Amino acid sequence: MEPEAEIIRAQLFALRDEAYRTFHSALMPTVPPETVIGVRVPALRRLAKQLAGTAQAEVFLQALPHGYYEENNLHAFLIELIRDYDRALAETEAFLPYINNWATCDCFCPKVFAKHKKELLVPIRRWLDSGEVYTVRYGMEMLMRYYLDDAFRPEYLEWVADVRSTEYYINMMRAWYFATALAKQPDAALPWLTEKRLDLWTHNKAIQKAVESRRIPLGMKQLLRGLRIRS
């Protein structure tokens, strides 16, 4: 390990919260507990801001794979702070294959992506087709984050629906995407449920998440409850 990366690891251990480590480890069954230091997200984000743009950060970004969960999250937060689109995209694509849990996958989104929605669709399609669990999940997350408002097109619903997998963390994101689409684009999303165009698990899970959401009107929730399919 490069000395710069060793220094950053020591900084992370200095921020360790053992009680938080125990609690958070239980939420991530795919992450070995011994690889979790126990650093809270606000502290990681503060450290990322301190390191951003430094030579130390550049060395750290090249030090893949990392040994600890928090090193991966710090890596993600450093990518978020990159202001150049091409560089942020390149670092994201280099990092995605090393993500091994939902929490790291869902924790970051480079701010510069919001200014390049048209260009971002190309890598999103590539991520959806990758076959890698968390790369696929990340692609769906980007569609959910940036393309359910003014940039929405009905075909994006098809992109997510066309992802076929037995992986839990992919299918949970598919359901989350459709639940969010019901809140933001109900006219386009609702027919996917009324016409039963999704697989049974995603259909029912999307309804469950939508009914639990505060963004869905009560009338819509009543309709959705009636669309549940009993297996």
Model-derived features with residue positions:
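Alpha-helical scaffold domains
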Residues: 1-231
